[in-house]
Every structure is written in C-alpha cells, then in structure tokens.
C-alpha cells in the first residue's frame, strides 16, 4: 500500500528581514538548555559517604579544636598554678630565711647582753681584787728586797771573813820575820853560843869514867828554848836593851 502524500508548504525566508540578526540575538539571549544529568546510584552513595565523612571530619575538627582550647586553658591554668606554687615556695623560703636571720640576731643580742652583764659583774670584782693584786705585787717586791738583802748580807759576810783571815795571818808572818838576837846576860835566858854548846855536848873521857850519866836537867839546859811569839819576843828584846 502506498503512503498518503502529505501537504507540503513552501516557506520563503526572504519575507523575514532580520533573519540573521534574530538568529544571533536568539543565540545570545537564550543559552543552551540546561539538562539535568541523572547520577548513578554509585555516585550518590559515594557522595553520601563523602558527605558523612566530611561531616565526621568537621565534627572531629571541631572536637579537636575544643580539646586544643581546653588543653590550652588547662596549660594556662597549670602554668598559673605552677607560678603560684613557685611564688609560694619562694615566699616560704624567704620567710624561713628571714626567721632564721631574726633568730640569729636575737641570739647575738642575747649573747651580747649576757657578755655585757658578765663584764659589768666582773668589773667590781676586778676593782676589789686590784688592791690585793697590788699588795701581792708589793709583797713580791718585799720578797725581792729580802732576797737582795740576803745577797747583800752574804756578800758582807764573805767580805768580813777574809778580813778575819787577814787578822789571823799576821801572827805567822811575825814569827817568820822576827828572829830574836842572842842575849848576853847573867841570868837572862838566851840561845847559847855554838862553842858553849859544843863544849857542853863533848865532855872529856875522864868525866865520862868518873861521873855517871848526866841528869836529865842538863839535857834540858842544853836544848834550845822554845820559840816565842812575836809579842813575847818583843818583850824579851825590851829588857835586853835596858841591860
């Protein structure tokens, strides 16, 4: 079967004057039609997952930001607490050092006051003892004088002893120097001469036969008289001069 023929109308474009301009304006004014592209279910799932992940990431980031802020605040508080602790420790140390210095000052003052009191108490005792010390020193001086007097006495005694010896010594000197001269007198006692003594000592042989031994008186007469002291010799010499 043949198809029916359609009625065709011939259109003259020349009738329209602004055909080219209209096309240009139309192309400028109306852009291409926007068509929505249908996304596949996989892409939708991926988008959903990415959205969830982005939300989770944002939440995590927010949590992290909050935590960091909290940490910063805690660290700031900790630093402040540490600073306060350090300040307290320093204050305690300073207070302890001040207390120790005050105690030392108090002890030094107490010791100084005690020493002053002891010095004040010792001052009158020293004043009292000063006189006794002077007396003791005077006694020492007396002792020294006594010792010096003893030495002087010893020296005087030593000097006096040789004087006594000198007094005793002249007697033997006089004995040695004084030689009594033979006295010529009748009844005076004197040293016999050598001739007389020889005659008396050498008797004749006849007399020896006739006479017995000579009595002891003759022997005594023949012996020289004992030596007299210088004074006695001087006394004997005086009467000899008178004769």
From Swiss-Prot:
A GO term for molecular function: transcription coactivator activity
Subcellular location, principal: nucleus
Modified residues (Phosphoserine): 14, 19, 54, 58, 61, 73, 75, 79, 113, 130, 132, 144, 181, 204, 214, 223, 229, 234, 240
Tissue specificity of this protein: Widely expressed, with highest levels in thyroid gland, prostate and uterus and in fetal liver, thymus and lung.
Extent of Acidic residues compositional bias: 111-124, 132-145, 232-243
UniProt modification remark: Phosphorylated in an ATM-dependent manner in response to DNA damage. Phosphorylated by CDK1 and casein kinase.
This protein's encoding gene: NUCKS1
The species this protein was found in: Homo sapiens
Lineage: Eukaryota, Metazoa, Chordata, Craniata, Vertebrata
Region (Disordered): 1-243
UniProt name for this protein: Nuclear ubiquitous casein and cyclin-dependent kinase substrate 1
Annotated Low complexity bias: 91-100
Subunit description: Does not interact with RAD51.
Localization per Swiss-Prot or TrEMBL: Nucleus; Chromosome
Entry function: Chromatin-associated protein involved in DNA repair by promoting homologous recombination (HR). Binds double-stranded DNA (dsDNA) and secondary DNA structures, such as D-loop structures, but with less affinity than RAD51AP1.
Record keyword Cytoplasm present: no
GO CC, any one term: nucleus
